[in-house]
UniProtKB/Swiss-Prot annotation:
Any one biological process term the GO annotation gives: isopentenyl diphosphate biosynthetic process, methylerythritol 4-phosphate pathway involved in terpenoid biosynthetic process
Protein's gene: dxr
Broadest EC class assigned to this enzyme: oxidoreductase
Role: Catalyzes the NADPH-dependent rearrangement and reduction of 1-deoxy-D-xylulose-5-phosphate (DXP) to 2-C-methyl-D-erythritol 4-phosphate (MEP).
Domain of life: Bacteria
Catalytic activity: 2-C-methyl-D-erythritol 4-phosphate + NADP(+) = 1-deoxy-D-xylulose 5-phosphate + NADPH + H(+)
Protein name: 1-deoxy-D-xylulose 5-phosphate reductoisomerase
The family this protein is said to belong to: Belongs to the DXR family.
Cofactor(s) needed for function: Mg(2+); Mn(2+)
Pfam families: DXP_redisom_C, DXP_reductoisom, DXPR_C
Gene Ontology terms, MF aspect: 1-deoxy-D-xylulose-5-phosphate reductoisomerase activity; manganese ion binding; NADPH binding
Length: 400
């Protein structure tokens, strides 16, 4: 997508107050000649959104409700900030697709990020994709829209960005056509990699959220602890790189230094390494095909000294198996998996279920819900709702 190089690129950051959003703004602030924040959106952290608006002076801010909008407008006026406040999903879609926008960072967590991310794609934007649900829930629809509208899709997940960097430029011709044998998706194994399986019954939300290598929000931290995060990434990788699930192999790599690898038919294996800091993939995607300083410290190979690899233990991490099965089933199965997982993780964070019950609950919902095609966004949300209802029913049935 062409843009006037004499002015900074205008960036909409969907999910500006989350960890990806804040890292994006950090990179943007390092390059004021290249980038400026056009719109920032937030959900519950309105005070943080106010501070970001005062600092970055976007044209627009988006909040979820009229009440939040009234509050933010008053605070912005008091701070002498002229940022215009929009509200709700309509506001999100407006700033994602606005004619002035050059690139959209899609970093809203969960199903709430789906419509605005799709709006950016349908407007043919350069989309920096950090929202997992766009591909997990509606991969076929989403990738078809990317193709039809000529949007540029750049993955932000450190693993998918690593794969993207290790792929030849023409990988869209098909993996076998460009000599790719398989994709190796790395996983840290999370905080419970070596916890005895029987001890997982008693782990707390606090323990699950204490990731050894990455700083993340609570939901994704639990997903990392259960390895559902890696399962969702496997589904995403299949859509992003047009791969069948059997071509994507998960490798546990505790140091989180190698972010993923691509194995070629000639015996070459290309890997992308770096310190575990989301500013690297963000800077890579913002500047692609160029390179810019991200603020991340150079990798010290001598300090790392060693890199370890092991196969994932699917007895310890049944969520990984469930995600692979959903990827193989296709159609509505990944959307159902995702919805059931969201309800289960929330219940675990509220101490209503134990950690191993996350997988048990998801498996029962997957068994109950038939796999059907999802020809429209309405069908995607209908499958999502049915899975949430079945999940809540499971909680009621088990007295939670």
């Amino acid at each position: 997508m062409g843009c006037d190089v004499s002015r900074p690129q205008r960036i909409t950051v969907l999910g500006a107050t989350g960890s990806i959003g804040l890292s994006t703004l950090d990179v943007i602030a390092r390059h004021p000649d290249r980038y400026q924040a056009f719109a920032l959106t937030g959900y519950s952290r309105i005070d943080e959104l106010l501070a970001l608006c005062v600092r970055h002076r976007p044209a627009f801010a988006v909040v979820p409700s009229t009440e939040a909008a009234v509050r933010l407008r008053a605070s912005l006026a008091a701070a002498g900030c002229t940022t215009e406040v929009l509200e709700g999903e309509a506001g999100l879609c407006q700033v994602a697709s606005a004619a002035e926008v050059d690139a959209v960072m899609a970093a809203i967590v969960g199903a709430a990020g789906l419509r605005p991310t799709l709006a950016a794609v349908e407007a043919g934007k350069k989309v920096l994709l950090a929202n997992k649900e766009a591909l997990v829930m509606s991969g076929a629809l989403f990738m078809e829209a990317v193709r039809q509208k000529g949007a540029v899709l750049l993955p932000i997940d450190s693993e998918h960005n690593a794969i993207f960097q290790c792929m030849p430029g023409d990988y869209a011709r098909g993996l076998s056509a460009v000599g790719v044998r398989r994709i190796l998706l790395t996983a840290s194994g999370g905080p419970f990699r070596e916890t005895p399986v029987e001890a997982l019954l008693d782990v707390t939300p606090e323990q699950a959220c204490a990731h050894p290598n990455w700083s993340m929000g609570r939901k994704i931290s639990v997903d990392s602890a259960s390895m559902m995060n890696k399962g969702l990434e496997l589904i995403e990788a299949c859509w992003l790189f047009d791969a069948v699930p059997s071509k994507v192999e998960v490798v546990v790599h505790p140091q989180s230094v190698i972010h993923s690898l691509v194995d070629y038919v000639d015996g070459s294996v290309l890997a992308q390494l770096g310190n575990p800091d989301m500013r690297t993939p963000i800077a890579n995607a913002l500047a692609w095909p160029e390179r810019i300083d991200s603020g991340v410290a150079p990798l010290d190979l001598f300090a790392i000294a060693r890199l370890d690899f092991q196969a994932p233990d699917e007895q310890r991490f049944p969520c990984l198996r469930l995600a692979r099965q959903a990827a193989e089933a296709g159609n509505s199965a990944p959307a159902v998996l995702n919805a059931a997982n969201e309800v289960a993780v929330q219940a675990f964070l509220e101490r209503r279920i134990r950690f191993p019950e996350i997988a048990g609950m998801i498996e029962q919902v997957l068994d109950q819900e038939p796999v059907v095609p999802l020809p429209s966004l309405d069908a995607v949300f209908a499958a999502d709702q049915r899975a949430r209802e079945l999940s809540r029913e499971w909680l009621r049935r088990h007295g939670r």
